[in-house]
Amino acid sequence: MPTRTHKLFLILLLLCVLPYTTLAQEPDTTGGIPTGADVQPETPVDEWTGKTVLVVGAHPDDDSYAYGTLSLLRENDNEIHVLIMTTGNVGTKDPDMTRTRLSQIRREEELAALSALGIPEDHYINLGYTDGMLEFADKKEVVKQLVYHIRTLQPDVLFAFDPGYGYQAWHKTDHRSASYLAADAARAAEWRLLFPGQINHEGLDAHRIEEYMFFGGPDEAKNVTVDISGAHAENKVQAISKHLSQFSSAWRDYTPELPPDERETYMQNIRERALDSTEAGQPVERFRYYEGIPDGIGKRRGEY
């Protein structure tokens, strides 16, 4: 017969083991996706004001995932900066197009799109890398440049491709690279002994980005929905429409102006593309919001 001491020992053992048994039996339905569905911004995104926002993408037009939200943030007196890593100088099927010409076209299209959102030209940064070749670039140099701009702008919020899920491993090479490079730069920017010359010789300060808005991920990973109805939806449509070289017949045979018989169809297609995500009949944009240290960007809830 067990003694009282034995009973106490068994009870203590059960108390120690039971929590781990419960956790082990809890099914993982995320498929490795960082969820964080219970994490929300302390202040709703549509009430943000006075923040500095940095959007990082691979190509001119990658920021279109967030055009509606950027329009809203700009109206609410937030400062928006857009950093694109490549010139987009390969994205065409036009046999007569050259890299140099397409690079200039895509710069002009991006600036026109940003203007439609109220974002000034001097808030646009392009690192100048060749489209499709980002993963072969010197990673240290790319991260160094990104860190420089993070330390210069001191952003409160980073918008970027979501690096924290399996889809990126198989997606378009530049998007995959941009997602990881942005995360690596956010991590490096806060450590003063990484790229110390920027601090010791260029007068910059180390900087930690506190909030992240990731786009391009699966719906089940997204935890923030931004209502872009009204003027912001229309601004998004107009901004995306500026990328003629990517979304019209100019993709195969570039002309700076659409043929008259294509204009109506083009704008209809752009509108459908821009406003394809809705909630309660209203256009929205969805993101995976994360707040905290960069090392936790890709962790699932409860991981350490």
List the predicted regions and their residue ranges:
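Metal-dependent de-N-acetylase/amidase catalytic core
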Residues: 2, 10, 24-53, 140-304
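Active-site rim/loop-helix segments in enzyme catalytic domains that contact anionic ligands
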Residues: 24-153
